[in-house]
């Protein structure tokens, strides 16, 4: 008997209010880290109707022009006209940044050159063989749709689109393998002049059928395009946005657990971010090496402590090796202290704006060092000993 089920993941465009906040926070981080690699940054952003507030904590000698940074991000996203509900020129930008507590910093920067974890917490990484980038198919497809919404808007293929938008894909699985797409949901902000009929037809033709892999498409896919019938008011005018509210979109679309810590606006001494990248690096290399077909990796840390307090590997019955053997391999092959992660993944670079929309994982950009599979041979060698 076939084990059959549907699994769903969603993504959002760069013009979604929560993603706007993520991008502003990461732009602030990039500006500072490019000029001060020793900086400690925890930047939170709120966007709402007509204004943006930047808050959080910093420890740096760098002056960051918050207004300029925020306005440039909003402009690049495409909020260039008050008719869109937000305009980079007229929106107020408020700066509420404070200084990092010395009580936190004393546990992070150590005299011996090591780095203690910036907080306690647990982080997860995941990889599987459903796509070439070793990501789950539903989130991979949802990101493709969300990215295409923005690209077709920016290149004027679909000039009636506006920046805010969401996508959702339900995939049909049989015996734990994806076989087809069952349902696609796309909600996109649009100009008031376009008819819903034309919008739906254009989105399906220009985005769905030109972007998604043909092997998963068929005539019976259920489409819901702007199912409420209208989406003119969007962006921060329609909903407030906050940094860190799209943590499942940012990761694996619900295919594995999440420790709860957001990424954007945090420098790599914060293990919420850097250890989640390391956990993906571990999981992806385990799958790429062939020792398993699927891997969930959990790392956990204590504030001010150098070594992780626990490492857990679950291969979902796809490996001939036990969790104990796999964990020994991970400890031998990967550097999982905060300093080891930062150095091995070269994280003290202004790369974070690239991560802040369309997923932190599964995009094999040169800057995304955690997506490299350069540890696969070491893993194979470990199990040949």
From Swiss-Prot:
Binding-site positions, Mg(2+): 18
Molecular function per GO: ATP binding; magnesium ion binding; methionine adenosyltransferase activity
Cofactor info, note text: Binds 2 divalent ions per subunit. Binds 1 potassium ion per subunit.
UniProt subcellular location: Cytoplasm
Residues annotated for ATP binding in this entry: 16, 164-166, 230-231, 239, 245-246, 262, 266
Principal location class: cytoplasm
Family in the record: Belongs to the AdoMet synthase family.
Protein name: S-adenosylmethionine synthase
Organism, scientific name: Helicobacter pylori (strain HPAG1)
